[in-house]
Amino acid sequence: MEKGKTSRLIPKFMFSHFSHHVATGVLIPLLPLLRESFGLNYFQSGILVSSFSLAYGMGQVPMAILADRFSKRLIIILGLIGVSLSGICVSFTQGFWQMPPFFVLMGLLGGTYHAPASAFISQNISIDQRGRALGMHVTGGSASFLLTPAMALGIASMFESWRPAFLLLALPALLAGGVIWLTTSEPAEDPLIPDKGTGKRLAEEKAQEAELTWVGIARAIGILVCLTITMNVVFASINSYLPLFMVDHHGISAEWAGIVVSLIAGAGIIGSPVGGALSDRLGRKELILFSLTLSGPLFFAVTRSPLWVPLILSLFFYGLTMSARMPTTESLIADVVPVRRRTTVLGIYFFMTMETSGVITPIVGRLIDSYGLDPVFTGIAIGLCVVAGVALLFRRHI
Protein backbone atom coordinates (compact mmCIF):
# COMPACT_ATOMS: atom_id res chain seq x y z
CA MET A 1 0.00 0.00 0.00
CA GLU A 2 1.34 3.44 -0.90
CA LYS A 3 2.47 5.80 1.82
CA GLY A 4 -0.32 8.28 1.17
CA LYS A 5 -2.89 5.55 1.58
CA THR A 6 -1.41 4.27 4.84
CA SER A 7 -2.02 7.66 6.46
CA ARG A 8 -5.73 7.21 5.75
CA LEU A 9 -5.82 3.56 6.74
CA ILE A 10 -5.82 4.03 10.52
CA PRO A 11 -8.89 6.34 10.70
CA LYS A 12 -10.84 3.79 8.65
CA PHE A 13 -9.89 0.99 11.01
CA MET A 14 -10.52 3.15 14.08
CA PHE A 15 -14.06 3.63 12.79
CA SER A 16 -14.35 -0.09 12.02
CA HIS A 17 -13.14 -1.01 15.52
CA PHE A 18 -15.56 1.47 17.06
CA SER A 19 -18.46 0.17 14.94
CA HIS A 20 -17.63 -3.46 15.69
CA HIS A 21 -17.76 -2.91 19.45
CA VAL A 22 -20.87 -0.71 19.24
CA ALA A 23 -22.75 -3.51 17.46
CA THR A 24 -21.47 -6.22 19.82
CA GLY A 25 -21.67 -4.11 22.99
CA VAL A 26 -25.37 -3.25 22.98
CA LEU A 27 -26.52 -6.34 24.88
CA ILE A 28 -25.14 -5.59 28.36
CA PRO A 29 -26.60 -2.07 28.81
CA LEU A 30 -29.95 -3.22 27.37
CA LEU A 31 -30.15 -6.42 29.41
CA PRO A 32 -32.50 -4.91 32.05
CA LEU A 33 -34.91 -3.87 29.27
CA LEU A 34 -34.74 -7.32 27.68
CA ARG A 35 -35.46 -8.89 31.05
CA GLU A 36 -38.49 -6.65 31.47
CA SER A 37 -39.72 -7.24 27.91
CA PHE A 38 -39.50 -11.05 28.00
CA GLY A 39 -39.82 -11.63 31.76
CA LEU A 40 -36.37 -13.21 31.97
CA ASN A 41 -34.83 -14.64 35.12
CA TYR A 42 -31.10 -14.41 35.93
CA PHE A 43 -30.39 -17.77 34.31
CA GLN A 44 -31.99 -16.73 31.03
CA SER A 45 -30.20 -13.39 31.14
CA GLY A 46 -26.95 -15.27 31.63
CA ILE A 47 -27.71 -17.47 28.61
CA LEU A 48 -27.93 -14.39 26.40
CA VAL A 49 -24.59 -13.06 27.64
CA SER A 50 -22.84 -16.43 27.49
CA SER A 51 -24.20 -17.31 24.04
CA PHE A 52 -22.39 -14.26 22.69
CA SER A 53 -19.24 -14.23 24.84
CA LEU A 54 -18.40 -17.93 24.50
CA ALA A 55 -18.92 -17.87 20.73
CA TYR A 56 -16.91 -14.63 20.54
CA GLY A 57 -13.92 -16.26 22.19
CA MET A 58 -14.25 -19.58 20.37
CA GLY A 59 -14.43 -17.83 17.01
CA GLN A 60 -11.05 -16.09 17.34
CA VAL A 61 -8.72 -18.92 16.29
CA PRO A 62 -10.78 -20.45 13.43
CA MET A 63 -11.38 -17.03 11.88
CA ALA A 64 -7.70 -16.15 12.27
CA ILE A 65 -6.68 -19.37 10.50
CA LEU A 66 -9.10 -18.60 7.67
CA ALA A 67 -7.66 -15.09 7.40
CA ASP A 68 -4.11 -16.44 7.11
CA ARG A 69 -5.24 -19.08 4.62
CA PHE A 70 -7.32 -16.82 2.36
CA SER A 71 -7.56 -13.06 2.95
CA LYS A 72 -7.45 -10.88 6.07
CA ARG A 73 -9.26 -8.10 4.28
CA LEU A 74 -12.08 -10.35 3.08
CA ILE A 75 -12.58 -11.89 6.54
CA ILE A 76 -12.74 -8.42 8.13
CA ILE A 77 -15.31 -7.20 5.59
CA LEU A 78 -17.53 -10.27 5.88
CA GLY A 79 -17.31 -10.12 9.67
CA LEU A 80 -18.35 -6.47 9.93
CA ILE A 81 -21.29 -7.05 7.61
CA GLY A 82 -22.25 -10.26 9.42
CA VAL A 83 -22.10 -8.69 12.88
CA SER A 84 -24.31 -5.86 11.65
CA LEU A 85 -26.89 -8.21 10.13
CA SER A 86 -26.91 -10.32 13.32
CA GLY A 87 -27.70 -7.24 15.40
CA ILE A 88 -30.46 -6.26 13.00
CA CYS A 89 -31.94 -9.77 13.28
CA VAL A 90 -31.93 -9.51 17.09
CA SER A 91 -34.02 -6.35 16.82
CA PHE A 92 -36.78 -8.32 15.06
CA THR A 93 -36.96 -11.28 17.46
CA GLN A 94 -40.31 -11.87 19.15
CA GLY A 95 -39.34 -14.33 21.87
CA PHE A 96 -36.46 -15.19 24.17
CA TRP A 97 -35.44 -18.45 22.49
CA GLN A 98 -35.12 -16.69 19.13
CA MET A 99 -32.31 -14.52 20.51
CA PRO A 100 -29.49 -16.92 21.57
CA PRO A 101 -28.87 -18.27 18.02
CA PHE A 102 -28.37 -14.74 16.73
CA PHE A 103 -26.04 -13.88 19.61
CA VAL A 104 -24.04 -17.05 18.89
CA LEU A 105 -23.84 -15.99 15.24
CA MET A 106 -22.82 -12.47 16.26
CA GLY A 107 -20.10 -13.90 18.51
CA LEU A 108 -18.68 -16.22 15.85
CA LEU A 109 -18.67 -13.46 13.24
CA GLY A 110 -17.25 -11.05 15.83
CA GLY A 111 -14.20 -13.29 15.95
CA THR A 112 -13.33 -12.08 12.45
CA TYR A 113 -12.17 -8.64 13.55
CA HIS A 114 -9.39 -8.28 16.13
CA ALA A 115 -6.68 -10.66 14.92
CA PRO A 116 -7.18 -10.05 11.17
CA ALA A 117 -7.40 -6.26 11.64
CA SER A 118 -4.24 -6.07 13.77
CA ALA A 119 -2.39 -8.28 11.27
CA PHE A 120 -3.66 -6.26 8.30
CA ILE A 121 -2.60 -2.96 9.88
CA SER A 122 0.82 -4.31 10.84
CA GLN A 123 1.35 -5.49 7.28
CA ASN A 124 0.67 -1.99 5.93
CA ILE A 125 2.54 0.15 8.46
CA SER A 126 6.33 0.44 8.74
CA ILE A 127 7.85 -1.36 11.70
CA ASP A 128 9.08 1.86 13.34
CA GLN A 129 5.50 3.25 13.46
CA ARG A 130 3.62 0.02 14.14
CA GLY A 131 3.05 0.53 17.87
CA ARG A 132 1.60 3.99 17.41
CA ALA A 133 -0.66 2.81 14.57
CA LEU A 134 -2.01 -0.16 16.53
CA GLY A 135 -2.43 2.09 19.57
CA MET A 136 -4.57 4.49 17.56
CA HIS A 137 -6.59 1.52 16.33
CA VAL A 138 -7.26 0.41 19.92
CA THR A 139 -8.72 3.84 20.75
CA GLY A 140 -11.66 3.04 18.48
CA GLY A 141 -12.61 0.16 20.75
CA SER A 142 -11.98 2.20 23.90
CA ALA A 143 -14.24 4.99 22.62
CA SER A 144 -17.02 2.49 21.97
CA PHE A 145 -16.82 1.13 25.53
CA LEU A 146 -17.17 4.70 26.74
CA LEU A 147 -20.09 5.69 24.49
CA THR A 148 -22.10 2.56 23.68
CA PRO A 149 -24.03 2.31 27.00
CA ALA A 150 -25.15 5.93 26.72
CA MET A 151 -26.11 5.57 23.05
CA ALA A 152 -27.99 2.30 23.59
CA LEU A 153 -29.95 3.56 26.59
CA GLY A 154 -30.57 6.94 24.94
CA ILE A 155 -32.06 5.37 21.80
CA ALA A 156 -34.11 2.90 23.85
CA SER A 157 -35.45 5.75 25.97
CA MET A 158 -36.25 7.87 22.92
CA PHE A 159 -38.22 5.11 21.18
CA GLU A 160 -39.43 3.46 24.41
CA SER A 161 -38.17 0.10 23.16
CA TRP A 162 -34.89 -1.82 23.06
CA ARG A 163 -35.43 -2.88 19.42
CA PRO A 164 -34.42 0.41 17.71
CA ALA A 165 -31.19 0.44 19.72
CA PHE A 166 -30.11 -2.95 18.34
CA LEU A 167 -31.18 -1.93 14.84
CA LEU A 168 -29.62 1.54 14.66
CA LEU A 169 -26.38 0.67 16.46
CA ALA A 170 -25.81 -2.27 14.11
CA LEU A 171 -25.74 0.00 11.05
CA PRO A 172 -22.28 1.61 11.59
CA ALA A 173 -20.64 -1.83 11.28
CA LEU A 174 -22.41 -2.34 7.95
CA LEU A 175 -21.09 1.03 6.79
CA ALA A 176 -17.59 0.18 8.04
CA GLY A 177 -17.60 -3.07 6.07
CA GLY A 178 -18.47 -1.12 2.93
CA VAL A 179 -15.73 1.44 3.59
CA ILE A 180 -13.05 -1.24 4.03
CA TRP A 181 -14.29 -3.05 0.92
CA LEU A 182 -14.26 0.03 -1.33
CA THR A 183 -11.17 1.86 -0.06
CA THR A 184 -8.56 -0.78 0.82
CA SER A 185 -6.65 -3.44 -1.06
CA GLU A 186 -4.61 -6.50 -0.22
CA PRO A 187 -1.10 -5.58 1.03
CA ALA A 188 1.66 -6.50 -1.39
CA GLU A 189 4.47 -6.96 1.12
CA ASP A 190 5.28 -7.09 4.81
CA PRO A 191 5.85 -4.53 6.12
CA LEU A 192 6.98 -1.20 4.72
CA ILE A 193 10.65 -1.02 5.70
CA PRO A 194 12.37 2.31 6.40
CA ASP A 195 14.83 3.24 3.65
CA LYS A 196 17.34 5.00 5.89
CA GLY A 197 19.91 3.54 8.23
CA THR A 198 18.37 0.27 9.33
CA GLY A 199 16.76 -0.95 6.11
CA LYS A 200 19.32 -3.65 5.38
CA ARG A 201 19.33 -4.93 8.96
CA LEU A 202 15.53 -5.02 9.10
CA ALA A 203 15.38 -6.86 5.80
CA GLU A 204 17.81 -9.46 7.14
CA GLU A 205 15.74 -9.82 10.32
CA LYS A 206 12.59 -10.32 8.26
CA ALA A 207 14.29 -13.06 6.26
CA GLN A 208 15.18 -14.81 9.52
CA GLU A 209 11.65 -14.39 10.90
CA ALA A 210 10.18 -16.02 7.79
CA GLU A 211 11.92 -19.24 8.85
CA LEU A 212 10.58 -19.19 12.43
CA THR A 213 8.80 -22.37 13.51
CA TRP A 214 6.05 -22.54 16.13
CA VAL A 215 8.68 -23.51 18.71
CA GLY A 216 10.82 -20.56 17.69
CA ILE A 217 7.86 -18.19 18.01
CA ALA A 218 7.09 -19.52 21.50
CA ARG A 219 10.71 -19.08 22.57
CA ALA A 220 10.92 -15.58 21.14
CA ILE A 221 7.77 -14.05 22.63
CA GLY A 222 5.99 -16.73 24.67
CA ILE A 223 6.84 -15.43 28.14
CA LEU A 224 6.07 -11.79 27.34
CA VAL A 225 2.75 -12.69 25.73
CA CYS A 226 1.84 -14.88 28.72
CA LEU A 227 2.59 -11.95 31.04
CA THR A 228 0.27 -9.76 28.97
CA ILE A 229 -2.46 -12.41 28.98
CA THR A 230 -2.14 -12.56 32.78
CA MET A 231 -2.64 -8.80 32.99
CA ASN A 232 -5.55 -8.95 30.54
CA VAL A 233 -7.30 -11.66 32.56
CA VAL A 234 -6.79 -9.86 35.87
CA PHE A 235 -7.90 -6.58 34.30
CA ALA A 236 -11.12 -8.12 32.95
CA SER A 237 -11.90 -9.85 36.25
CA ILE A 238 -11.29 -6.69 38.27
CA ASN A 239 -13.44 -4.58 35.95
CA SER A 240 -16.38 -6.94 36.47
CA TYR A 241 -16.44 -6.25 40.21
CA LEU A 242 -15.20 -2.66 40.47
CA PRO A 243 -18.74 -1.17 40.35
CA LEU A 244 -19.75 -3.46 43.24
CA PHE A 245 -16.61 -2.41 45.11
CA MET A 246 -17.56 1.25 44.68
CA VAL A 247 -21.03 0.60 46.10
CA ASP A 248 -19.93 -1.59 49.02
CA HIS A 249 -16.70 0.17 49.95
CA HIS A 250 -17.55 3.81 49.24
CA GLY A 251 -21.35 3.71 49.53
CA ILE A 252 -22.02 5.47 46.22
CA SER A 253 -25.14 4.80 44.15
CA ALA A 254 -25.26 1.99 41.59
CA GLU A 255 -25.67 4.52 38.77
CA TRP A 256 -22.48 6.38 39.68
CA ALA A 257 -20.64 3.12 40.28
CA GLY A 258 -21.30 2.08 36.70
CA ILE A 259 -19.33 5.10 35.47
CA VAL A 260 -16.15 3.53 36.88
CA VAL A 261 -15.69 1.19 33.92
CA SER A 262 -16.33 4.07 31.51
CA LEU A 263 -13.63 6.10 33.26
CA ILE A 264 -11.11 3.30 32.76
CA ALA A 265 -12.17 2.93 29.11
CA GLY A 266 -11.74 6.67 28.67
CA ALA A 267 -8.19 6.40 29.99
CA GLY A 268 -7.54 3.83 27.27
CA ILE A 269 -8.20 6.46 24.60
CA ILE A 270 -4.99 8.14 25.79
CA GLY A 271 -3.05 5.14 27.08
CA SER A 272 -3.23 3.00 23.94
CA PRO A 273 -1.66 5.40 21.40
CA VAL A 274 0.85 6.71 23.95
CA GLY A 275 1.87 3.19 24.96
CA GLY A 276 2.16 2.08 21.34
CA ALA A 277 4.24 5.12 20.39
CA LEU A 278 6.55 4.67 23.39
CA SER A 279 7.06 1.02 22.47
CA ASP A 280 8.25 2.16 19.03
CA ARG A 281 10.94 4.22 20.74
CA LEU A 282 11.80 2.27 23.89
CA GLY A 283 11.03 -1.32 22.88
CA ARG A 284 8.11 -3.73 23.26
CA LYS A 285 9.54 -5.71 26.17
CA GLU A 286 10.34 -2.58 28.15
CA LEU A 287 6.79 -1.23 27.83
CA ILE A 288 5.18 -4.55 28.78
CA LEU A 289 7.39 -4.87 31.87
CA PHE A 290 6.74 -1.22 32.76
CA SER A 291 2.98 -1.76 32.56
CA LEU A 292 3.24 -4.93 34.64
CA THR A 293 5.39 -3.20 37.26
CA LEU A 294 2.90 -0.36 37.76
CA SER A 295 -0.26 -2.50 37.63
CA GLY A 296 0.01 -3.86 41.19
CA PRO A 297 0.79 -0.56 42.99
CA LEU A 298 -1.83 1.35 41.00
CA PHE A 299 -4.53 -1.22 41.67
CA PHE A 300 -3.59 -1.17 45.35
CA ALA A 301 -3.99 2.62 45.20
CA VAL A 302 -7.48 2.12 43.72
CA THR A 303 -8.47 -0.09 46.68
CA ARG A 304 -7.10 2.38 49.26
CA SER A 305 -7.83 5.82 47.79
CA PRO A 306 -10.55 7.94 49.41
CA LEU A 307 -13.59 8.87 47.35
CA TRP A 308 -13.59 11.42 44.54
CA VAL A 309 -10.36 13.11 43.38
CA PRO A 310 -7.78 10.59 44.71
CA LEU A 311 -9.93 7.66 43.60
CA ILE A 312 -10.62 9.16 40.17
CA LEU A 313 -6.90 9.78 39.63
CA SER A 314 -6.03 6.25 40.74
CA LEU A 315 -8.62 4.75 38.38
CA PHE A 316 -7.47 6.93 35.50
CA PHE A 317 -3.78 6.09 35.85
CA TYR A 318 -4.61 2.43 36.40
CA GLY A 319 -6.61 2.38 33.14
CA LEU A 320 -3.86 4.37 31.41
CA THR A 321 -1.15 1.90 32.39
CA MET A 322 -3.15 -1.22 31.63
CA SER A 323 -4.23 0.03 28.20
CA ALA A 324 -0.65 0.79 27.16
CA ARG A 325 0.27 -2.89 26.96
CA MET A 326 -2.43 -3.86 24.41
CA PRO A 327 -1.00 -2.31 21.21
CA THR A 328 2.50 -3.06 22.49
CA THR A 329 1.79 -6.79 22.64
CA GLU A 330 0.09 -6.80 19.24
CA SER A 331 3.14 -5.00 17.82
CA LEU A 332 5.48 -7.49 19.48
CA ILE A 333 3.64 -10.38 17.82
CA ALA A 334 3.69 -8.58 14.45
CA ASP A 335 7.42 -7.85 14.79
CA VAL A 336 8.34 -11.49 15.35
CA VAL A 337 5.74 -13.74 13.70
CA PRO A 338 5.92 -14.28 9.92
CA VAL A 339 2.99 -12.99 7.85
CA ARG A 340 1.70 -16.45 7.01
CA ARG A 341 1.15 -17.23 10.72
CA ARG A 342 0.64 -13.78 12.20
CA THR A 343 -3.16 -13.68 12.24
CA THR A 344 -3.31 -17.18 13.73
CA VAL A 345 -0.95 -16.24 16.58
CA LEU A 346 -2.94 -13.06 17.23
CA GLY A 347 -6.11 -15.17 17.22
CA ILE A 348 -4.62 -17.53 19.82
CA TYR A 349 -3.63 -14.51 21.92
CA PHE A 350 -7.16 -13.04 21.84
CA PHE A 351 -8.72 -16.47 22.41
CA MET A 352 -6.57 -17.12 25.50
CA THR A 353 -7.46 -13.71 26.93
CA MET A 354 -11.20 -13.98 26.34
CA GLU A 355 -11.76 -17.59 27.35
CA THR A 356 -9.46 -17.47 30.38
CA SER A 357 -11.20 -14.31 31.57
CA GLY A 358 -14.53 -16.11 31.28
CA VAL A 359 -13.25 -18.86 33.58
CA ILE A 360 -11.34 -16.71 36.08
CA THR A 361 -14.02 -14.04 36.63
CA PRO A 362 -16.54 -16.34 38.39
CA ILE A 363 -13.69 -17.83 40.44
CA VAL A 364 -12.79 -14.34 41.63
CA GLY A 365 -16.48 -13.80 42.39
CA ARG A 366 -16.55 -16.97 44.47
CA LEU A 367 -13.50 -15.81 46.43
CA ILE A 368 -15.19 -12.46 47.04
CA ASP A 369 -18.31 -14.25 48.32
CA SER A 370 -16.15 -16.29 50.70
CA TYR A 371 -13.63 -13.71 51.92
CA GLY A 372 -14.94 -10.27 50.94
CA LEU A 373 -13.93 -7.65 48.38
CA ASP A 374 -11.12 -5.99 50.34
CA PRO A 375 -9.03 -9.13 51.05
CA VAL A 376 -9.42 -10.45 47.49
CA PHE A 377 -8.59 -7.13 45.81
CA THR A 378 -5.60 -6.66 48.13
CA GLY A 379 -4.44 -10.19 47.33
CA ILE A 380 -4.70 -9.49 43.59
CA ALA A 381 -2.64 -6.31 43.97
CA ILE A 382 0.04 -8.17 45.95
CA GLY A 383 0.01 -10.99 43.40
CA LEU A 384 0.60 -8.54 40.55
CA CYS A 385 3.53 -7.04 42.47
CA VAL A 386 5.04 -10.50 43.00
CA VAL A 387 4.68 -11.42 39.31
CA ALA A 388 6.26 -8.09 38.33
CA GLY A 389 9.14 -8.64 40.75
CA VAL A 390 9.90 -12.09 39.35
CA ALA A 391 9.66 -10.79 35.77
CA LEU A 392 12.07 -7.94 36.50
CA LEU A 393 14.48 -10.30 38.25
CA PHE A 394 14.67 -12.52 35.17
CA ARG A 395 14.11 -9.80 32.55
CA ARG A 396 17.32 -10.62 30.67
CA HIS A 397 16.03 -14.12 30.02
CA ILE A 398 12.57 -13.02 28.82
Model-derived features: positions:
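Extracytoplasmic gate region of multi-pass secondary transporters
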Residues: 27-28, 219-265, 269
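Interfacial helix-cap and linker-helix signal at transmembrane-aqueous boundaries
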Residues: 34-35, 66-67, 154-160, 246-247, ...
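Conserved MFS/SLC helix-loop-helix module at the cytosolic interface between two early adjacent transmembrane helices
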Residues: 58-94, 279-285
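Cytoplasmic helix-loop-helix junction between adjacent transmembrane helices
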Residues: 102-140
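Helix-loop-helix hairpin linking two adjacent transmembrane segments in secondary transporters
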Residues: 137-186
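Flexible cytoplasmic inter-helical loops of multi-pass small-molecule transporters
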Residues: 184-210
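C-terminal transmembrane helical hairpin of 12-TM major facilitator-type secondary transporters
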Residues: 282-329
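A late C-terminal transmembrane helix in Major Facilitator Superfamily
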Residues: 336, 340-373
